[in-house]
Amino acid sequence: MDSTSSLHGSSLHRPSTEQTRTDFSWDGINLSMEDTTSILPKLKRNSNAYGIGALAKSSFSGISRSMKDHVTKPTAMGQGRVAHMIEWQGWGKAPTIQPQHSHEAVRRDTDAYSDLSDGEKEARFLAGVMEQFAISEATLMAWSSMDGEDMSVNSTQEPLDCNYSDNYQELMESQDALAQAPMDGWPHSYVSQGMYCLGSSDAWEASDQSLIASPATGSYLGPAFDDSQPSLHDMGPSQPASGYSAQEPPPLLGVDTDWASEVGGVELARGPVEEEKRPLAPEEEEDAGCRDLESLSPREDPEMSTALSRKVSDVTSSGVQSFDEEEGDANN
């Protein structure tokens, strides 16, 4: 086979040997009709997956560019036109009473929109988009502000609950500590402060816990005074306080109606007989009983005792004070 004839691509006969299998050659590139891979430019005949992937990628890039130029842009313009029509017609607004010839108004609006230039259409489209963004942002800000208010309310309620629980716990602990305190010492302190007036001498016995008044109750209602105890009239001048045991102190002011029988023992020890037998008014007896309780309490300075007695006497009502004044005038 002549080399010149092979360069010009003119072959007169087909050789039978496999070495001269390619019949045509053009610009140094061998072409074979039997090998289809030879049509790929600048690729080997035995092309691998990399070459196929590169071809697919380039093909996809070209196809996507073509789609963008011929399909995407017109579709986007069409969607923009729909958005323009939505904003133009005000479909998102509340429904209003439509006139009889509403289709004519729609047609006029459509014609007016069609008469707009591309710049005006784009401007209207951007205005509509910005309006929607503004509405969405305002809505999100409103929701976030509501969430913030809820969080602030919860945060303010939580410390209040904590403070309430702490105060309640402190109150319970103080009550427990007061209940566990020695019971034989509290009447003296409370009576010295002018807060309590006990009913009978049984309250001073620490052995019987059921008869001891609790500070939380605010008052003491002891058992009824025993009738077997000698009264004021039965006891003579020679028996000042012989009817009572040595361990048991004289009876104190109580809640019974027989005031003279309860205060008699204490008064006999402190004053003459004729002064004790003089009938006392209930108000005077109450003041005398409180003074006796103050004498039983631990002694303090005279000024403090005077202030405490004044505090106890101030508990009486205005009517009682007026009654005392009238009785003093009558005695004078």
From Swiss-Prot:
Query: What superkingdom does the record give?
Result: Eukaryota
Annotated transmembrane regions: none
Which stretches does UniProt call biased (Acidic residues)? 323-332
Q: What Pfam families would the database entry show?
A: FAM131 (PF15010)
InterPro entries given in the database record:
FAM131
Q: What is this protein called?
A: Protein FAM131B
Record has Translocase as a keyword:
no
Q: Which PANTHER family match?
A: PROTEIN FAM131B, PROTEIN FAM131B-RELATED
Q: Which residues carry this modification: Phosphothreonine?
A: 316
List modified residues, type Phosphoserine: 47, 114, 117, 295, 297, 313, 317-318, 322
Amino acid composition bias (Basic and acidic residues), ranges on this chain: 101-111, 272-281, 288-302
Family, per entry: Belongs to the FAM131 family.
Q: What keywords would UniProt list here?
A: Phosphoprotein
Please list where the region (Disordered) is annotated: 1-22, 95-114, 221-332
